[in-house]
Amino acid sequence: MVREVRENELDDLLELYLYLHEKSVPEMTEHLKETWDTILHDRNHHMIVNEVDGKIVSSCVCVIIPNLTRNIRPYALIENVVTNEAYRGKGYATACLNYAKELAKQSNCYKMMLLTGSKKEETFSFYRHAGYNHADKTAFIQWLE
């Protein structure tokens, strides 16, 4: 079942992020709690999860960003697309991305964007199959410390 994350599912989400790029689950600090609270109460920040048999197996983040161009239409940024390795290839992440797409449409977004750090062809194929292309724009990243 695809839905938005519940407040009591932070630990489950952090465990899932171990399949993304995290090396360990962060310690439950005041900063982490405040960040979680900020995310949960931001109407433009959507933490989407796919639950199978009571377990969160896939997730993505969809942030709706207000915009003054394109006829004052917002755009959506997708981040942290991840699926538990044991559940990959079954459409769970695609379902999360489709949920994000519906949220973006409901918000009248004119586009959705995502970046991937992967250089694997199967990752590119996955995103192309989900409706994304890498030909229209060029991304530049500046990492901040």
Located regions from the model:
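Conserved GNAT-fold acetyl-CoA-binding loop/helix
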Residues: L14-D37
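A short beta-loop-alpha structural element at the N-terminal edge
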Residues: M1-L13, P26
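Conserved beta-strand-loop-alpha-helix junction that forms the acyl-donor binding cleft
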Residues: M113-T123, I141, E145
